[in-house]
Amino acid sequence: MLVACALAILPARAAEPQAPGMSMVTFNLHHDREDWPQRRQVILRELEALQPDAIALQEVIQKPYVRNQAAWLAGKLGYDYQFVSTDPPGRFKRYGNALLTRRPVLARGEHLLAPRTDYRTVAHLRIDVDGQPVNVYATHLNERSDENGGRIRGEQVADLLKYIAATSGDAPVVIAGDFNALVDAGDLSVLRQRYGDSYGSVHVNNELAQVSTLNRHYYEAPSRIDHIFFQQDQLVAREARLLFDQPYAEGRWASDHYGVWARLQFAP
């Protein structure tokens, strides 16, 4: 009895502090299809709960009766944002990619990827994560599944890496988005020489071929094509999971893609 009483009054052990690092989300919004006013509330609630350091968004749209989706989410979250589109400012409809962050922005940029005829972009923010600069990039590569699509994605990856080399300096790099390619696809082989797959690094013992970021409600075959890549000599993936992989109501989904969340740790 005395031992039990003594144990009862011992102070609770403090939780182990997490090692310095950052969290990242990537998510294809499916633009304004299928009840965007309802979907955006579902997306907002999840992002509010997660409070990621940075968010990469694809298929972001802005139309006369649809406020820029990245701007709306950033405003509700209290985040800064960078929207990138090949559609010029002032155009009645603009479509592109975006980065959102709750961290101070040290630099920002954008780039139109080669081949220019495919109208693909990359957004860049350098953010301050508790005194550590980190470069985050968001992109969305060509969607074709044939040989020509692979060739185009290969060209886009080469141009993306060239842009990163010109803008990243010495700070760690995270690249997120909808790559329309499996992580081991030849299209991504050059990128994978230096950048790790956050989800695959964490779930090494799982049957990754059965994991899909395409919503199985819309697509029959599993396909993990949405990725968060991290610079392997600067960062380590500690946690990763899918987001929005359950309906928020019967037959209602946040998007035709699932999101990906990852927690990255700065390498010692």
Segments predicted by a language model, with ranges:
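Active-site neighborhood of phospho(di)ester-bond hydrolases with catalytic His/Asp-centered motifs
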Residues: 56-58, 82-85, 174-178, 197-201
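Structured beta-strand-rich core segments of catalytic domains in phosphoester-bond hydrolases
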Residues: 36, 54, 58-141, 236-244
